[in-house]
Amino acid sequence: DCLPDWFHYEGHCYRVFDEPKKWADAEKFC
């Protein structure tokens, strides 16, 4: 199960952020 406002995809939880980020930046941000 994912936290509220997060969605489940292929065994992982994701969240959409208002500000665009590159994958590398997103990984560091998480």
Swiss-Prot record:
GO terms for cellular component: extracellular region. It is found in: Secreted. The keyword Calcium applies. Its main location: secreted. Keywords: Blood coagulation cascade activating toxin, Calcium, Cell adhesion impairing toxin, Disulfide bond, Hemostasis impairing toxin, Prothrombin activator, Secreted, Toxin. Expressed by the venom gland. InterPro entries: C-type_lectin-like/link_sf, CTDL_fold. Belongs to the snaclec family. Heterodimer of a metalloproteinase subunit and a regulatory subunit comprising two polypeptides disulfide-linked (14 kDa and 17 kDa chains). Calcium-dependent prothrombin activator. This protein may activate prothrombin via recognition by the regulatory subunit of the calcium ion bound conformation of its gamma-carboxyglutamic acid (GLA) domain, and the subsequent conversion of prothrombin to active thrombin is catalyzed by the catalytic subunit. This is Snaclec carinactivase-1 regulatory subunit 14 kDa chain.
